[in-house]
Amino acid sequence: MQSDINKNHLTMTEGLTYINESGLKEEESKNIVGYNINGSIIDLFTPLPTITKEVIPITIDSEDGLEMLRHSAAHILAAAVKNLFPTVKISIGPSIENGFYYDFDAERPFTPEDFPAIEAEMQRIINESIPFERIEISKAEALEFFSSLHENYKVEIINSLEDGNITLYRIGNFTDLCKGPHVPNTNFIKAFKLLSVAGAYWRGNENNQMLSRIYATAFPNKKLLKTYLTQLEEAKRRDHRKLGKELNLFEFHEDIAPGMVFWQPNGMLLRTILEDFLRKEHLKRGYQLVQGPQLLRRELWEKSGHYTNYKENMYFTEIEEDVYGIKPMNCVSHMLLYKTHLHSYRELPQRYFELGVVHRHEKSGVLHGLLRVRQFTQDDAHIICMPEQLEEEIIQVITFVRDLMSLFDFNYHIVISTRPEKSIGSDYAWELATSALIQAVEKINLPYSINHGDGAFYGPKIDIKVTDAIGREWQLSTIQCDFTLPERFELEYVGQDGKRHQPVMIHRAIFGSIERFIGILTEHYAGAFPTWLTPIQVKILTVTDAQTPFAKHVYSQLQDVGIRVGLDIRNEKLGFKIREAQLAKIPYILVIGQKELELESVNVRLRTGENIGMQSVTEFIKLVENDCIQPFKRGGMNYRFS
């Protein structure tokens, strides 16, 4: 079989010929790993099609080049593992954001203790500059080849493919099923690191074999790798799951409620502050507060399309022989609220806002702290308006998003997602909705990109992606335009002409999930939340028992003006109490000793360790008030102190 594969071996000749004739400098051509031709990414092994448009070279340090590099590194990882552990079966190994992984069926799961040996073998393969060879064979030949190697996972994949030629890639004595593209040889991987191990079910199905997944990353040079590893260490320090325990915010009990949050007192206070702020901001902007039930009959979910398109993510229960769905979204309830009476065009838009608890089934393997849960609260709003009001309403929502992102000091960018393969509604409605989103964004001169095919099943959407303090990207806000559900639920309004018309609906969530947003904020601020949001803003510490009465008096003064304050009058060493307050990331620490008692003042320290010095209680209250107000000025909003 090996000789049959050899005779189908394709070389890099055509790709290299193009590069040599392209007029590029020798140094530039060294970094080229492929090309973009007619919108397709092709490596140097793939025969060139008839060139009808511009051919764009892909360099190793470009986004496409980096993806090729990591995909190739995944093959090197698999080759190294097979060399060291010959009985291991290989499954899949794609590139992913910031790295790659490979899944193995091993006699025992891999552990980090295996990494040094695997990395050494990978480095040996890299040092030999082994070329990646592209091979095309028939489906029957591919089945025969992988069956002879007892690679059952590859056989299963091949059986699921349509008849025709199958593409393989080979480095040395290791051959893998793969479409490519890949870098020219193994020595293009200049820097890599194995990161972690995890369990992963074959094809993501919990009924299938549990595989051992090795996560890793690779970069074109060691400097980029070092920067990334430093960022990873910083991310570990900021991990919201770690900080959540340390700051008494939240916890999980996966044995009894997987993917559901238990809020501790500090976390519940922080969440309440955030939710109260959201309610006030929505009321100021013309929204009405509403709330719908948790359970709705299955017929409503069938009517909305959720039962057909989203059933696998929903929970159902039976009550008195009727099937009910636990809501995964709030839109159905909001449409029913709208329908309680007939609206005039003068009443539009109707803006409904709900901090709605929803449930969505996520597989246990993807649950991740607050960032991926099964029960969460959406800051969910639905705006029902006339088609001619649509653009202005979208602009107002984007403005709201901009204000909130400024408040939390997030940079952001906009992505518009278009119609997915699995969708409902007419072509005309989709075109109209997509056009409205694009026009609204362009009208306020904001840059955006298009993500084809990633819209909701009922309409296109705007996704707002933010960058946190250490450069990581998170998707937060979503704005969706929907002509379909108003039609399905027969929403109407009486127009200026006295006739009934169908409105359009905007689905939008700015934070998306309160739980997820708090998780992101925790990591963004490394647990040191801004003063206005911190559960405990001030901690009063006494030096001896003699200061206790005055400390209690200061405590009452601060409470009276709305400052969230704690009091520590324990008979402990002052240094210990200060350190404890700093670890709790309390913004202000007030020390009251004999001198402060005599002057009826407080000694002000910051959580950073800086000592501001002596202040009167009145001066300190003003300091805290200004600290709370400052972020809201940046966000273009007002802050009510108490």
Swiss-Prot record:
Identify which cofactors the protein needs according to its UniProt entry: Zn(2+)
Q: What is this protein called?
A: Threonine--tRNA ligase
Gene3D superfamilies named in the record: 3.30.54.20, Anticodon-binding domain, Bira Bifunctional Protein, Domain 2, Threonyl-trna Synthetase, Chain A, domain 2
Organism the protein comes from: Lawsonia intracellularis (strain PHE/MN1-00)
Give one GO molecular function term. ATP binding
Under the heading HAMAP family, the entry gives:
Thr_tRNA_synth (MF_00184)
EC? Answer: 6.1.1.3
Residues of the region (Catalytic) are 239-530
**UniProt xrefs under SMART domains:** tRNA_SAD
Disulphides: none
| GO cellular component entries | cytoplasm
Where the protein is mainly located, per its record?
cytoplasm
Please explain the role this protein plays, according to its UniProt record: Catalyzes the attachment of threonine to tRNA(Thr) in a two-step reaction: L-threonine is first activated by ATP to form Thr-AMP and then transferred to the acceptor end of tRNA(Thr). Also edits incorrectly charged L-seryl-tRNA(Thr).
Give the subcellular location.
Cytoplasm
Q: Which UniProt keywords apply?
A: Aminoacyl-tRNA synthetase, ATP-binding, Cytoplasm, Ligase, Metal-binding, Nucleotide-binding, Protein biosynthesis, RNA-binding, tRNA-binding, Zinc
InterPro entries associated with the record? aa-tRNA-synt_IIb, aa-tRNA-synth_II, aa-tRNA-synth_II/BPL/LPL, Anticodon-bd, Anticodon-bd_dom_sf, Thr-tRNA-ligase_IIa, Thr/Ala-tRNA-synth_IIc_edit, ThrRS_anticodon
Q: By its UniProt entry, which SUPFAM superfamilies does this protein fall under?
A: Class II aaRS ABD-related (SSF52954), Class II aaRS and biotin synthetases (SSF55681), ThrRS/AlaRS common domain (SSF55186)
Q: How does it assemble?
A: Homodimer.
Example of a GO biological process term: threonyl-tRNA aminoacylation
Q: Name the gene.
A: thrS
Domain of life (superkingdom):
Bacteria
